[in-house]
Swiss-Prot record:
Residues 4-244, 255-547 form the ABC transporter domain. This is Uncharacterized ABC transporter ATP-binding protein MJ1662. GO terms for biological process: organic phosphonate catabolic process. It comes from the Archaea.
Length: 555
């Protein structure tokens, strides 16, 4: 039985065709995958199938309907955590109440509770969360929250007994263990409910594990439709070969982490992190990767090394400076550090040149000299100035939040550290990132997805940092673009001697780029050494069957 019919579907944004005469069908009980590079039109297609985006030409029919698709589809989006801060089962019951009564999400009356609870437990079984029914949603892990959201979304399909599940890049940012659980849940939902599932992803391993059939979208057109392996081979044809880097690792440790411990405790939530006695070195010129399951403390360790947080115990020496001690030495050190966070954003209407000059000036000698004079004039201690200066390296939302708590705005940073540019010579960095000088006059809104990633890298590299920290900023890139990024990073390391420390869940990326890797698990450092061996141990501990099957395909 055909459940989804798409014929000559075209969607335009101005003169740009996001989708161009797209046609395909999907059968009941089929898991249909859609693959393509970033910007190929995958998410646009999913939004049209959901009924949340109009189209210009063509026909779309789902379960015999040509409109009101929201009534017969469920959608699961990447990084969407809208949940009630109540027990898990309440989140499902509220959704069921809204569906059955065409009302707001409320809890039913006491006499109705048992009937709602029975259905809610069956839905929780589908997503593997029945054992968590009484836990509060806000203390679930990221992967568990993803599955709870999926449970809420499929409630309508469960109630109606039919529907189509739409998945847009599910679990892209999840660790292998969380990803495995979500993939198994998707299979379970298809098997138990017998519904059609349409999934977009740029990750070949997800399509290999889940899909019965695969469509390749390229520049808004269907380039290929058929066997999963054949379509993936076509998709990956354009991947460049890996750059052969000549390592230049020095004997001295540019970062020393000694007996570092860090604990987080949440009221009503209990202990969320308890890293204990972590010690390791990073040699100058080395590319070191940190790997481990979600919530183990990878980002925390990176933030500690970058001086954005302080350890509860232990010491961290970065380029000869104790980064746990606030003061002018630490401020000077920050000039030699660059950091890219998991979610980076660029202001749409700024030119690349302005962004680069601004960043260069903010970390320049004159800005720091001005801060020293201004601090003396205002009677500010070096500790306060340092605490403010470190905010230039945190994500924008965190910076604004911390300043608001102090009753300040971002103006205070720029008054202390005015971005004065003495000389602007970006050519070397641009060339290493394969960006022409014409990029400088372009606004962010005019850039392609790949260009935005490289400009974000250039912002951190324009100051020629000795150390570059990367906290999973490339987790949602397609494998073709990710190979390009790996090559650029190896070139940067080779040409400028930049020490790179990165956090990633992508084992292929880690194996390709790293000199050494460390594995965090069970609140401690459990393995350190050869990236291939560390990644194999990570996969073993994660019980990630989809990755084991992927390795078999490659071998």
């Amino acid at each position: 039985m055909i459940t989804v019919k798409v014929k000559n579907l075209t969607k335009k944004y101005g003169d740009f065709k996001a989708l161009d005469k797209v046609s395909f069908e999907a059968k009941k009980g089929e898991i249909l995958g859609i693959v393509g590079k970033s910007g190929a039109g995958k998410s646009t297609l999913i939004r049209i199938l959901r009924g949340s985006l109009d189209y210009d030409e063509g026909e779309v029919e789902i379960l015999g309907r040509k409109d009101n698709f929201k009534e017969i589809t469920a959608i699961h989006l990447q990084r969407n955590f809208a949940l009630w801060a109540e027990p898990v089962i309440n989140n499902i019951i509220r959704k069921l109440y809204a569906i059955r009564n065409n009302a707001d999400e409320q809890l039913p009356l006491e006499e109705e509770w048992e009937e709602y609870e029975k259905t809610a437990i069956e839905i929780l079984k589908l997503v593997g969360l029945e054992h968590k029914k009484d836990a509060f949603a806000n203390i679930l892990s990221g992967g568990e929250k993803q599955r709870l959201i999926l449970g809420r979304q499929i409630a309508k399909i469960y109630e109606k007994g039919e529907g189509v599940l739409l998945l847009d890049e599910p679990a892209t940012m999840a660790c292998p263990a969380s990803k495995q659980k979500l993939l198994d849940v998707i299979k379970n939902i298809r098997d138990k409910l017998g519904i059609t599932v349409i999934i977009t992803s740029h990750l070949p391993e997800i399509h290999r594990y889940l899909c019965d059939r695969l469509i390749l979208l390229e520049n808004g057109k269907v380039k290929m439709d058929g066997d999963v392996e054949e379509v993936l081979n076509e998709f990956l044809k354009k991947m460049k070969p890996p750059y052969k880097r000549t390592p230049n690792i020095k004997d001295n440790a540019i970062i020393q982490v000694r007996n570092v411990s860090k604990r987080y405790y949440v009221v009503h939530g209990g202990e969320t992190l308890n890293l204990r006695n972590v010690s390791f070195d990073v040699k100058e010129g080395e590319i070191l990767s940190i790997i481990g399951p979600s919530g183990v403390g990878k980002t925390v360790i990176m933030r500690l090394m970058a001086g954005l947080e302080l350890p509860d115990e232990g010491k961290i020496i970065v380029d000869g400076i104790d980064i746990t001690n606030y003061g002018w030495e630490r401020i000077e050190l920050r000039k030699r550090i660059g950091i890219m966070h998991q979610e980076f954003s660029l202001p749409y209407y700024q030119t690349v040149e302005n962004l680069l000059k601004y960043r260069l000036g903010l970390k320049g000698e004159k800005a720091i000299a001005h801060a020293k004079a201004k601090a003396e004039e205002l009677g500010l201690s070096p500790k306060i100035v340092d605490a403010l200066y470190q905010l230039i390296d945190v994500p924008e939302s965190e910076r604004i939040s911390k300043l608001q708590k102090m009753g300040l705005t971002e103006d205070i940073i720029y008054k202390l550290f005015p971005p004065v540019v003495e000389s602007f010579e970006p050519e070397e960095i641009l060339e290493a990132l394969d960006l022409g000088k014409d990029i400088l006059k372009k606004k962010v809104i005019e850039l392609s997805g790949g260009q935005k990633v490289r400009v974000a890298m250039a912002l951190q590299l324009i100051t020629k940092p000795k150390i570059l920290f990367l906290d999973e900023p490339f987790g949602d890139l397609d494998p073709i673009t990710l190979r390009d990024v790996a090559n650029y990073l190896k070139i940067i390391n080779e040409r400028f001697g930049t020490t790179i420390v990165l956090v990633s869940h992508c084992v292929e990326f880690i194996k390709e780029i790293s000199d050494r890797a460390i594995l965090l698990d069970e609140n401690r450092l459990v393995m350190e050494g050869n990236p291939e061996e560390v990644c194999e141990e990570f996969i073993r501990r994660s019980n990630a069957r989809f990755m084991k099957e992927e390795l078999k395909c490659k071998n």
